[in-house]
Amino acid sequence: MTIGRTLRAGVLALQGDVREHLAALEACGAEAVPIRRASELADLDGLVLPGGESTAIDRLIRAFELSEPLKAFIASGKPVYGSCSGMILLADRIADPALDRDGAPQRTLGGLDVTVRRNAFGRQRDSFETELKFDSLSDSERPVHAVFIRAPWIEQAGSEVEVLAVVRIEGIDRAVAVRSGNLLATSFHPEVLVQESETSELRVHELLVSMMASRLSQDANQAESRK
């Protein structure tokens, strides 16, 4: 069944790489919109949780009363992609959560059966770029040019989580891209390269848009079968 309309993707727009993700999604043919209110989630086919500062985004999510609506969106099965701090927000567990002034650990939205470590590759000065083999992308034989900025890695993943890319650190393969059902997460920032012609990387966002199209088609087929 054909979709018959433009896919609508939201980018949580409280802090972080919002404009870059909007541009990447538009370049993939989706209608991309910033999301700041719970009511704006209703008409989305998919959602991006952008890179930024995970503790700041956690505080803003609570301040804007978005925690429960976002958890409900994730639980709905619609595709969600988290990059860098977005991966932290999707994780069920944080190995080293930041603490607020009262000693309470930062919270996540959850949904992805992984344990992440914040700033695992180091601080801002330790940011780096590398070429990654990334399964499940179009032209998967061509490596992804990945930008890591104060990035997390995944220390443990559940049995239903598929590891799509790893970085080898001190002899250990660290998972930096995973998928579980319609949840997708990367430690790195593909969105920052969208405007750079020599290294432009849209394939991660193309994967998200493909997931959105598949979900919408499944919903349409189920609705048709109930008639």
Curated annotation (Swiss-Prot):
Q: Which organism is it from?
A: Renibacterium salmoninarum (strain ATCC 33209 / DSM 20767 / JCM 11484 / NBRC 15589 / NCIMB 2235)
PANTHER family, per this entry? PYRIDOXAL 5'-PHOSPHATE SYNTHASE SUBUNIT SNO, PYRIDOXAL 5'-PHOSPHATE SYNTHASE SUBUNIT SNO1-RELATED
Q: What is this protein called?
A: Pyridoxal 5'-phosphate synthase subunit PdxT
NCBIfam families registered for this protein in UniProt: PLP_synth_Pdx2
Asked if the keyword RNA-binding belongs to this entry, the reply reads: no
Any keyword Transferase?
no
Q: Provide the organism lineage as a comma list.
A: Bacteria, Bacillati, Actinomycetota, Actinomycetes, Micrococcales
Give the highest taxon in the source lineage.
Bacteria
The UniProt catalytic activity note for this protein reads: aldehydo-D-ribose 5-phosphate + D-glyceraldehyde 3-phosphate + L-glutamine = pyridoxal 5'-phosphate + L-glutamate + phosphate + 3 H2O + H(+); L-glutamine + H2O = L-glutamate + NH4(+)
Stated family: Belongs to the glutaminase PdxT/SNO family.
Q: Report the record's Gene Ontology biological process terms.
A: glutamine catabolic process; pyridoxal phosphate biosynthetic process; pyridoxine metabolic process
